[in-house]
Amino acid sequence: MNHAITMGIFWHLIGAASAACFYAPFKKVKHWSWETMWSVGGIVSWLILPWAISATLLPDFWAYYRSFSASTLLPVFLFGAMWGIGNINYGLTMRYLGMSMGIGIAIGITLIVGTLMTPIINGQFAVLMHTQGGQMTLLGVLVAVIGVGIVTRAGQLKERKMGIKAEEFNLKKGLLLAVMCGIFSAGMSFAMNAAKPMHDAAAALGVDPLYAALPSYVVIMGGGALVNLGFCFIRLAKVKNLSVKADFSLAKPLIISNLLLSALGGLMWYLQFFFYAWGHASIPAQYDYMSWMLHMSFYVLCGGVVGLVLKEWNNAGRRPVSVLSLGCVVIIIAANIVGLGMAS
């Protein structure tokens, strides 16, 4: 496995670790509605940071975006909006299925769809099936899905042991939402594929290859922001017990604390895709579709590790922790199989 591929896998691990931790600051926000908190974090992660970083990287910010036709930008934006719909469905999936089953089904589906649909759309899948490297990377995807399944099983054992139940369990509704979440969340992978002309144009302007994907986030995350912020703003306007005015009528120190914590959560959310771009740039072009598999499987891995570090599994007993550890090991093996496949 060469150095570039190793670093690509490493950067995806760092990005996934940030994704697994980003909600921690949000949990410390007090006396704010979820909609206000999520909107503040979202404005930072989906609007301020993509625009600020792109303005820093590009020699002429507006000229860069004006150089693309609507036929190039629109699919990128719409795939970003597609991801935004998946993001909203994610929370509803947890509500009706519980954390473990919801995450397992949603992440498993988005891992498969987001990883395999790209080479299918690009007409590369048949080639991958008949080359040693392609076969190994596809085997890695299968092993990763097995690893996610094992971690999901560990979560179910933990919830059963600790008496944790879904807020409003509904198998039929939950499964439908989980499938929708998995498919729509893959929009980020599709958006990155559609944004390749934007990445190439940024590189042609002298932007370092590690950063070449970042200017496309203005469009991708703009689509996601439209859906997420629109959802939050509509609820803030329509739901009687939600009020932005009330949220900002708290004591000034608490407002400042909530703003900073929400902004920190937004920063950590953005960093997952900042390092995703670095990992994506380090992977051989013919295997760039594997970025999504690495990100999502590492997200599950890091989520399990973070849970152990935060002592969320202390009262779960030995068996759930053992199953979780096995799942994490399987995901690590999957990443190595993919790395060897890309290097062959």
From Swiss-Prot:
Tagged with keyword Transmembrane helix: yes
Gene Ontology MF terms in the entry: rhamnose transmembrane transporter activity; symporter activity
Ranges annotated as spanning the membrane: 4-24, 38-58, 68-88, 101-121, 131-151, 175-195, 214-234, 259-279, 290-310, 323-343
GO CC annotations, alphabetized: plasma membrane
Topology versus the membrane: Multi-pass membrane protein
Record keywords, A-Z: Cell inner membrane, Cell membrane, Membrane, Sugar transport, Symport, Transmembrane, Transmembrane helix, Transport
Compartment annotation: Cell inner membrane
Keyword hit for Transmembrane: yes
Enzymatic reactions: L-rhamnopyranose(in) + H(+)(in) = L-rhamnopyranose(out) + H(+)(out)
NCBIfam families, per database record: PRK13499.1-1 (NF010021), PRK13499.1-3 (NF010023), RhaT (TIGR00776)
Family of this protein: Belongs to the L-rhamnose transporter (TC 2.A.7.6) family.
Cited function: Uptake of L-rhamnose across the cytoplasmic membrane with the concomitant transport of protons into the cell (symport system).
HAMAP family: RhaT
Protein name: L-rhamnose-proton symporter
Source species of the chain: Klebsiella pneumoniae subsp. pneumoniae (strain ATCC 700721 / MGH 78578)
Highest classification ranks of the organism: Bacteria, Pseudomonadati, Pseudomonadota, Gammaproteobacteria, Enterobacterales
